[in-house]
Amino acid sequence: MTTNLKQKLKTAPKKPGCYLWKDSNGKVLYVGKASNIFNRVHQYFQKNNPYKTQLLSSQISDVDFFILKDENDALNLEAKLINQYQPRFNLVLKQNNGYLYFYITKAKKPTLELARKYQIKTTKCFGPFASSKFKLREIHDLLLKLFPLRKCAPHQKNHPCFYFQMGLCMGQCMQTDTKEKYQQVISNIEQFFNDPSVVINYLKAAEKKASDNQEFEKAQQFLTLQKAVLELTKTHHTTIIKQKSSHDFIGYVFQNNVLAITIFCYEKGELTDKEQAVFTLEQTDIVEVESAIITFIYHHYKTTPLPSKITVSLDETNLKLISDSLKIGVFKPKNGNEKLILQTVIDNAKHALATKWLKFTSNYDKTQLHKDLAQLLNTDYIHSLEIIDVSFYDQNHVVGCMLRFEDGKKIKHLSRRYNINSLKKGDTNHIALLVYRRILSAMQTKANLPFSDLLIIDGGKAQIKSVKQVFSLFSNVKPPIIIGLVKNKNHQTDHIMLSDFQVKKIAINSPLFHYLATIQTEVDGFAKRSAFNKLSNHQLQNPLLQIPGVGKITAQILFDNFQTLNNIKLASVNELSQFIKKPLAQKIKTYFAKQTD
């Protein structure tokens, strides 16, 4: 296994998506899908694998990942990539691949149909869905029953058709249908894919009626159908862009002077390719970052065919600048669907950034880095260090986290998380209480958790001062060396602050800077995940997860962008809909408005 492949496997995303195994020449050997890419790709290198898998793994030199929203998107993309690359280790896919779309025909008197191919000329199209996963035929029949459109032949007049007599047809056969009725039914069907509550309530009532009549088999069918509807609408992110032309989505992430940019390329509404670039910037000012993004986009499309449209999140001035330069439409995401796609692109950029950071640090001599750090801090040697951070989504769910490193290697079994419960609020008080808990752990012989040589705090003067005050309470405890990692106004690692509040600058392209920035990012992510998990485990105290349609992923997106539950409550519908679909944003606002009444 090559060094490059080992590094990529270490940072493989623990999310749904597709992976492409490649040989030393960059040729795709195999395309696969997974609900957890990290777990799946590591299975290929187990010793007890069958011969074909061992033969494949012996030829693998590289891997590429597509992070997607769910397994359904992964199933769909896998089929496209296999047809595109024709990898030798993939079985040939049948043309009938099991993916279905709901679509409403583009006619004066439309019908609701199921098809195995995206119908670009339709009025509305929803999907694709894996037919093996959802009861699509049953759901189709259910929608026709609840929201009847035209079922009879266009020429049938003045005689009720079979479906009309059963209440399953709009009634063009009896001339009772109108344009307004069709529009209302189409609106109801479209609403179903965003909010299935009307259909779910119908199924619950039908289930109860069947159960009361002791028709338990029928009741079970209604229950199964409820689950299928919920799963279908939860999965329906609609990665379809309804247009015949090409459309590129550009997402980016900037952290610790490193900019990662990812482009998803869509052709005729379907994802066909991905481009990525990661590079270091000397300046961290947001104006310089956006300037670098504009320059990248301009040069990228000098050597790449232009799409018909580009979606990227930049200010209006920069959008116009790119549009005028490339002579095409460049826009911010306009609706919930485009925002969801762009968020997926950003997730891929985040992964590219994490992979780049690992590549930066894995090539360094970690022992030498600790020697360099000791020299900077005027001490003999730093064998071990601990870095701490706190995170919270509201003041009732605060978590403090600590990661321990010895000679540059993370010691997982010595890492800790602490629940922080304090009447005093604020980051400084939370840090102080975290250190207090850490000192108590060190004093307990059973804990076997002695102090490290160095304690790194995510913060500056106020945090360092509070930590020193905590240590002063314990006369029998010798404090470690204490420093703070201070971020700039753009929340990027900037400099070190010593315990005497002296500032130490580090060259941003130096191995030591990359190392410290990496572990700071790692403890920040550890703390945020821990705080969110704590909140999720207290659903009775977390009204957000009680709202129909809001799951853990949606809640995580909102908390990542608004930080606290109170901020989410105060946000407007437009502010919320920057990250989630507008109907769901309106539902959240309505839910919290009722609570305050």
Curated annotation (Swiss-Prot):
Keyword hit for Chaperone: no
Domain GIY-YIG, residue spans: 14-91
SMART domains: GIYc (SM00465)
Subunit and partners: Interacts with UvrB in an incision complex.
Gene3D superfamilies, A to Z: 5' to 3' exonuclease, C-terminal subdomain, GIY-YIG endonuclease, UvrC, RNAse H endonuclease domain
Entry keywords, A to Z: Cytoplasm, DNA damage, DNA excision, DNA repair, Excision nuclease, SOS response
Role, per record: The UvrABC repair system catalyzes the recognition and processing of DNA lesions. UvrC both incises the 5' and 3' sides of the lesion. The N-terminal half is responsible for the 3' incision and the C-terminal half is responsible for the 5' incision.
Location relative to the cell: Cytoplasm
Protein name in UniProt: UvrABC system protein C
GO molecular function, one term: excinuclease ABC activity
Keyword Cytoplasm: yes
GO cellular component: cytoplasm; excinuclease repair complex
Classification lineage: Bacteria, Bacillati, Mycoplasmatota, Mycoplasmoidales, Mycoplasmoidaceae
Main location: cytoplasm
SUPFAM superfamilies: GIY-YIG endonuclease, RuvA domain 2-like
Pfam families attached to this UniProt entry: GIY-YIG, HHH_2, UvrC_RNaseH, UvrC_RNaseH_dom
Family annotation (InterPro entries): DisA/LigA_HHH, GIY-YIG_endonuc, GIY-YIG_endonuc_sf, GIY-YIG_UvrC_Cho, RuvA_2-like, UvrABC_protein_C, UvrC, UvrC_RNase_H_dom
Source organism per UniProt: Mycoplasma genitalium (strain ATCC 33530 / DSM 19775 / NCTC 10195 / G37) (Mycoplasmoides genitalium)
BP terms from Gene Ontology: DNA damage response; nucleotide-excision repair; SOS response
